[in-house]
Amino acid sequence: EIVLARRPKVSLTTIILAAGKSTRMLSLKSKLLFKISGEYIIEHVYRAAASINSKNIVCVLGNSPQQLKDFIQKNKIQSVDQKNSCGTADAVKTAISSIPVNKNNKVLILCGDVPFISPVTLRKMISKLNNSDLCLGTCIQENPVGYGRIIRNNKNIVEIIEEKDASSKIKKINEINTGIICINEGVLRKFIGKIKNNNKQKEYYLTDIVKLLSDNDYKISSYTIKNDLETMGINSKKDLVDLERKLLIKKASNLLDKGVLIRDVMRTDIKGDLKVQKDVEIDINCIFEDKVSIGSNTTIGHNCYLNRCKIGKNVHIKPNTIIFGATIGDNCIVGPYARIRPGTVLKNDAQVGNFVEVKNSIIGSRTKINHLSYIGDAELGKDINVGAGCITCNYDGEKKHKTIIEANSFI
């Protein structure tokens, strides 16, 4: 009888480095709590870690502003405190000491200020550990100022030298370390405590583990990340704005390539998840946040703001309109200067005109509210004509009350 040995169970731990002081943001709050593309920077990183089935996700805090610590606690994210701010190796050592030992595990290390690393890239890096002990995420940059340089010997990575410790010759190397590292847990635990602080900053650099592994004949692999949006970090408000602008232009350009008529990709901000059908036209200065879907043959006028809403087909959203948390049926006309608030449903062929606000209401088919009105907590049937200046008085100072107007009425 042949007895096959069981393969050791392998799982993934992700460590997010978030212990920085955020001094270059010139702000009282952590840079990780600035929003980019509609969400906090730390949320983007955490989602990437969660999407690749990390068994443990540990966020390393330290001198982080209190708002970040409160956010981590509120969202029940596992965290550890780095008591002394003395480098990334010490941060990783603190994190790895907080989880149960499993030398067969893989450990992924992410930077908390690099928001757009993709799950696809992370999976490819992790798969490289099947044939190596450590995988580095690298990229080629025309202007690599500020980044650690990748040192190779006959194509093999032997060391990473940080910018502050680099000679003028090494600074000419344009292959840089992205800060994203995947390593076998057993190897990490063996070498993390051997890292020294023999550098100008007197810090314990995690990147020094590369030379330790190379000197001890461990196998080091790399994965070149070609999309620069995935590797761009945020240290200042300028970094934040520059990265978001690049992302927004890319999103708008992708939709343009798919047949959406976007009048100006430089002035269209898609900050969330925008799904668009055929023959949609979007004018300038429009902002889309959270999940927005737009049906075919629909036109969005200039200066519109759409957030968490569903727009039907053959709809005309006129300029300067705000739609938030609402559903707009087919063949509707909305605006200009209309405000459609959460809980509102416009049935097919309804019309809401200029300076009209609708909140938490159902507006029936072919019903028209064309001028200067407030409709709140109401249910309007079909084929109603609401004249200018109408208000549904929904609040008595203590409670909200519903207004019902039945079909074919004229107000």
PLM feature spans:
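Conserved core of the sugar-phosphate nucleotidyltransferase
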Residues: 66, 117-200, 207-209, 214, ...
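Short beta-strand/turn micro-motifs composed of small residues
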Residues: 18, 61, 111, 138-139
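Conserved alpha/beta core of the MobA/IspD/sugar-nucleotide pyrophosphorylase nucleotidyltransferase superfamily
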Residues: 153, 174-277
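Structural signal for interior beta-strand "rungs" in well-ordered beta-sheet cores
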Residues: 261-411
